[in-house]
Amino acid sequence: GYELGCSVAIEYEGKEVVNLYGGYTNTSKSTEWKKNTLVNVWSVTKAVTGICITKIVNDGLLNVDKKVSYYWPEYGINNPDTKVIDLLTHRAGMFGFKEGSPICSWNDWDVFVKALESQKPYYQPGSSQGYHALTFSWLVGELFRRVEGRMVGDYFRDEVASQYNLDFHIGLSEDQHYRCADISFKRFDNLKPPLEFIKYIPTIFLPNDLKNLKSSIVSQDFNHAFNGDLFNLNDPNSTDWRKAQVPAANGHGTAASLAKLFGILSTGCERDNIKLLDTTTLKTATSIKTRGPDTVLFGSKINFGLCFMLNGNETNKVNFAPVIKKDGFGHAGIG
């Protein structure tokens, strides 16, 4: 197969019942996958960010019906009509960088933020759904920072991970990078999927001969949202990427910690007498706010709550969240 190594964990009724891991963490197969190996979970990070958002809603700090400019005045100069809920549900029309991807370090937070502040949306905010694959990081992340005062990753570390002993990080300390499993692109060099499925595979994973073919069969919105210029081939394994806080895509953690985190949410939002948030707030956050069709993801009818991907994402070809059942919530990701 194409996997060098992997891990899977399951919690049931508040108890860990499965924690499996195996294989290797690099292409040279010189390091075995261990219990504490960390993996970049990509867009699963959006659900973790969603937990942080839900927590500050729960605490009365954020009102999702207010305009973004109420909390972030600079954003309102070019986007005066955008509501907070538009950012949280991929309906802000800001799924790409109109002037091209900023040329900077992943740690240059303000550069990304100012680029988005200075542009107008592709569509009228609230009028359509278009998956904000990476721009979600700086749109939702900067909103969060303006409201709470901390970056999402710092808040998650202080208020969630440390409370429940979770080995999950948005912005990984450099002294922990040795535990990371590398993302391998060469494993896909000989991949020859059917034509219909090429468009569903992230461009950075495709061999060169299929990249141009893909660009001809996907929408302009997709190309804006998944602009390959944002990534160099080694970026996901770089110190810069792992240290940065990219709350749409670069969460690093263990399967066991993710299972525990969502296990807490699914069993009353409390563990060891420590309350994470109110169940009523979680229920509101995980109810459907938008159903698509999604202009970035091929017109798919993807259901979102407040950052969370929900059940009901089937298309004729692909279900973007195949393990999410009725009343379930989380997020799909390529990690």
Q: PLM ranges: what are they?
A:
Residues 1-42, 61-66:
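Short, conserved catalytic-motif segment at the N-terminal edge
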Residues 28, 113-122, 232-241:
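The feature captures the short pre-catalytic strand/loop hairpin that immediately precedes
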Residues 34-36, 119-126, 136-139, 238-247:
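Flexible glycine/proline-enriched surface loops and loop-helix/loop-strand junctions
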Residues 35, 40-44, 56-100, 117-118, ...:
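Active-site helix/loop module of the DD-peptidase/beta-lactamase fold
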Residues 90, 136-143, 249-270:
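Active-site-proximal alpha-helical segments within enzyme catalytic domains
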Residues 99, 114, 120, 125-145:
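Internal, well-ordered domain-core segments that constitute the primary functional module
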Residues 186-255, 286-335:
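Active-site Gly/Thr loop motif
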Residues 270-284, 297-299:
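Short acidic alpha-helical/loop segments enriched in Asp/Glu that coordinate divalent cations
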